[in-house]
Amino acid sequence: MAASPDHDYERLGDKRLSLPDVIAQSVGFMGPVFSSAFVIPLVVGVISASGKGGGVAAPLSVLIAAVGVFALGWIVSSYSKQIHAAGSLYDYVTTGLGKRVGTAAGWLYYGGVVVLLTGLLLLIGGYLQGTLQSEFNISPLPSWGWTVVLTALIGVILYFGVQISTRAQLVLALVSIIVVTAFFIFVIVKLGSANSIKPFEPSSSADGWSGIFFGVLYGVLLFVGFETAANLAEETPNPRREIPIAVMTTAVIATVIYVIATYVEVAGFGYSLKTILSAAGAPLFALGAPAKAGSEGGRGGGRGACGSTGCWSSSCCST
């Protein structure tokens, strides 16, 4: 690499961020709980535009996607040992391929981040409004109003400094991951003898390797943002050490969570694509909801979670 480790970059902060802080940046941006709830159905293939996906073998698709993510993480880690700048990927590409390509990559990457965050804020605003209306019959704000409130809240947190924002991400990520992981473990324990290695066998995919690799394409989306710790290199006391550790640790954490989540969403619905499709919009909610709420996940007599959650009738796992 052409850049020197001592390259003189303008600093944004006073190097107060710890390793947990920069890990929180990557994990928080990646949003493993959100992705587990709404992106995994794409990996399975029940809501993908092509109609293809890993199917029952979706966990295998996630594992293969993780291999590529680890390779990318190694590249980012290698560059971060040499270049300690807030531009991260922009600076890496500029160093390797020149300013013109780096500028294009920077606009594409950070433009994509802005579009992604805008979309998420709109989605969350709509979800909050819809949930309050349907569950509590109240609607204090329209969906766009909640989006404005959330945007203002994020702005306030950022105003007080990156250390506050990363700590907030750390707390929120830990709480949400612990809760969801506990649910995953609960379902796996309740599955008992119904647990199987079937989701890790290529033959479990209805479309064979074609479907599995379609699942890989969507599986990569699960990891979007895992490399963003590199943006905080200027604000860490030892970026050569802490950024590579943060990036690779995030990749490991994400892989474990997503493989378990995908397995639970496949096994919890009785290894049945038809059943997964019936709850594709929000599979984790369906899997954990009581039968009186109309849940389809894990119902029935002998396969999948079948009575492991709040779902006790026999209509689902018989499919």
Q: Where are each of the predicted segments found?
A:
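Membrane-water interface regions at transmembrane-helix termini and the short interhelical loops
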Residues: 13, 79-82, 104, 130, ...
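Transmembrane helix-loop junctions in multi-pass membrane proteins
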Residues: 36-42, 46-49, 157-163, 310-319
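Loop-to-transmembrane helix boundary motifs in multi-pass membrane proteins
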Residues: 99, 114, 144-148, 237-255, ...
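Helix-loop-helix junctions that connect adjacent transmembrane segments
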Residues: 12-13, 55-59, 135-145, 170-294
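Extracellular loop-to-transmembrane helix junctions
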Residues: 32-138, 253, 260
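Short, Lys/Arg-rich, polar N-terminal cytosolic tail immediately upstream
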Residues: 1-16
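Structural signal for membrane-spanning alpha-helices in multi-pass inner-membrane proteins
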Residues: 73, 154-158, 180-187, 262-266, ...
